[in-house]
Structures are given as structure tokens and as C-alpha cells.
Amino acid sequence: MIICRTPEEISVQVRRWKAEDKKVGFVPTMGYLHEGHASLFRECLSKADKTVVSIFVNPAQFNDPEDYAKYPINTDGDLKICESGKVDLVFLPEKETIYPEGIPNVVLQVPHLMRNLCAVSRPGHFEGVLLVISRLFHFVKPDFAFFGKKDYQQYLLVKEFCKILAFPVEVIGCETIRSDKGLALSSRNSRLSEDEKEESLLISRALKLGEAQILSGIKDPVVVRDIMKDVLDSSPKIRLDYLEVLNADTLESLEILEGNILLAAAVFIGSVRLIDNRTLRVASV
């Protein structure tokens, strides 16, 4: 497994691969890797000839400095997971490598996909995501890029951003990986106590119940949202950030539940913010 720390090192290696007509897959991460990330590596291995993983905690996407300071880091463990996952190259840059002149005063947006959800509750977050992704894509020049659908809005944004700017990369969304009890895997889960982990299971239960209500024939999104909210409100430890029932393709509100549907939630348990979602399709009548 190759470890690169500069864009120049990556460029040399990727050029070699592409000269051999190899397809390059890319999984951008912020480290503290878990089985969810490993599943992205497997998807990449199934699609591309070479797998590149970046590990970089991007300061530009944190609207809360304390959240950035507390983000867990385990580089040695991450490298072991990458090696066992048959990753070909790991990009381990420093902040000064990605932003040699500091974080630039530039705003990258896809406005029609940034009117709700995390774009509203975490102002500046996705601008920072799009900034770092544009730089990483420029360095790696991947043919494919893999994103977990747990961060569903991020996946849609990056896909649309690449389409708008004509990045020659296919953005592929991968299904959320969960614990045996249903909790969506996240690096932030490590900051939860055992009691808080039990409480956090209400997030996936609420979303699953919402999905079941829709599949049972309920057409009113307000009714479904209220049912899910009752589940989350049953715990005094859960503080709701948002809970939405939206069109899964446009992130617009729905008046009637049909077509591609997204159920999305963000909550705080203590100081830890967790997100989760479910998508489903209901045929139009």
C-alpha cells in the first residue's frame, strides 16, 4: 500500500496507472474509519482497478470549532483498515497541503439542494465540503468516487456539483451500513456513552416506522412526520435538529407521498450530533 502526503506524489502515481489504462476509484474520508468506510472500499474494488483513499479532517466544513477540535483521530488504526481493505494508495495530507494559503474566501454552492437539512442547520458546512472535494478531485483525478448515503444530502450535492462543473468522475452512492441493532455507523458514535448509544437507536426506529407508515398507504407527509417525531420525543436525551419528509431527488417538500421519498433526521444526544435517513419509492396513483 502506497502512502502519499503531497499532491505531486499522487499525481505521479495516478499518471502511471492511467498510462496502463487502469481505472481509479476514490473514497474521500475524514478518518476514524469503521465498517461503513470499509464497505465503500469494497464497492470501489468491485468497480475500479485501483483504490485511493484520502484521510483528511477538513477544517473548512466545520461551522463549530469545538466540533472540529473533538473530531476523533486514529491514523494508525485507519491505515490498518485501509491495508486490510486492499486499498492501493492512501493520501494523508496536512492542512497546509490542502490549503497552502489558508482556507480561501470563496463560496461554492448548489443552491437548489441547499435549502434545508444540514445546509441550514450547519451553515457553511457544504461550502467547505465542495471546496475540499474539488481540490481532492483535482489531485486524484478519479474515474469513480464513492460516497455513503448516510450523508444523503452530501451525496446529492457532490453528484450535482460534478455534473455542473463537468468533472470527469462518476459519483456513486453506497448504502448505509448499520450496527446489529440498526444504528447507522458513524465516526461520531465513538463519542457516545453506552446509554446514549441505546437512546440513539430511536433514530433508526423512528425512520423505519415512518417508512412502514408510508408503505401501509399513508399519503400525508405531515402525518408521517408526526409519527416519527413522537418516537424521538419519547427520549428526554434526544434534542431534535430536523426531521423531514422530502422528495429524494430534489430535496423539495412533498404534498403527497409518492415517487422517490427521503425521510431524514438529525438529532443531538448530549453534545453529539447524529444524522440518519431512509429512502423509498412509492408508485404514483
UniProtKB/Swiss-Prot annotation:
Homodimer. It catalyses: (R)-pantoate + beta-alanine + ATP = (R)-pantothenate + AMP + diphosphate + H(+). Belongs to the pantothenate synthetase family. ATP binds at residues 30-37, 148-151, 177, 185-188. (R)-pantoate binds at residues 61, 154. It comes from Leptospira borgpetersenii serovar Hardjo-bovis (strain JB197). This is Pantothenate synthetase. One of its GO terms (molecular function) is pantoate-beta-alanine ligase activity. Pathway: Cofactor biosynthesis; (R)-pantothenate biosynthesis; (R)-pantothenate from (R)-pantoate and beta-alanine: step 1/1. GO terms for biological process: pantothenate biosynthetic process. The reaction proceeds by a bi uni uni bi ping pong mechanism. It is found in: Cytoplasm. Beta-alanine binds at residue 61. Coiled coil: none annotated. Its EC number is 6.3.2.1. InterPro entries: Cyt_trans-like, Pantoate_ligase, Pantoate_ligase_C, Rossmann-like_a/b/a_fold. HAMAP family: PanC (MF_00158). Catalyzes the condensation of pantoate with beta-alanine in an ATP-dependent reaction via a pantoyl-adenylate intermediate.
